Amino acid sequence: MHICIINSIIWFIVKYKKKHGYSLFVEFTHAYGIGEGTSVNMRGVNIGYIKNLQINSNSVLVSIYIKSEKILIPKNSIIETNQTSLFNNTIIDIIPLEKINNYSIRDFNVFNQNCYDLQIFCNNQYIIGDRGLNYDDLIRATTRIAQRFDDPRFFNLFYLFLQNTIEISDDFILTFNNISSMSYYLYIFCRDFLLNNI
């Protein structure tokens, strides 16, 4: 009976410790395909998810849940949305731009009032997010390039460039052949001159 109670207490403590994370609020100008449950990654590792999403007239406010209070995110970080595949799988990437000194922040946690003076994000802190890699932009840019190549003026200019290049190369080959012929005749002349005068 006592073992069962002790196991229950240990299970509850472990379960409570595992689920004790913190929240951040990130504002984006556009949702870029993110939604509730979207993964949040830092250095390629999943550290949380989107808990809630609120659309305003000029922006989208996202509530991010970080799974553990031990995961410290530097304030000098880029927080951006990225598409990970052609199937429109979107994630939020946190890219730290500097290393933080673990010794200076090891005694603090994200729930402490002094946390705001440190170089890490704190619980319920407000952050502005950016737009990262997006396949829609890539497709638009490719379409624009294809439209430029489809322009007849471009092909006329390209054809003129190729024609001039071919003419220049033909002239270069002719000039090179003339120079090599002249050098051959000069060699024969010098050889005969030297052989006759020696």
Curated annotation (Swiss-Prot):
Transmembrane segments: none annotated. It is found in: Plastid, Chloroplast. One of its GO terms (cellular component) is chloroplast. InterPro entries: Mce/MlaD (IPR003399), TGD2-like (IPR039342). It comes from the Eukaryota. Its main location: plastid. Keywords: Chloroplast, Plastid. Pfam families: MlaD. PANTHER family: PROTEIN TRIGALACTOSYLDIACYLGLYCEROL 2, CHLOROPLASTIC. This is Uncharacterized protein ycf22. It comes from Antithamnion sp. (Red alga). The lineage of its organism: Eukaryota, Rhodophyta, Florideophyceae, Rhodymeniophycidae, Ceramiales.
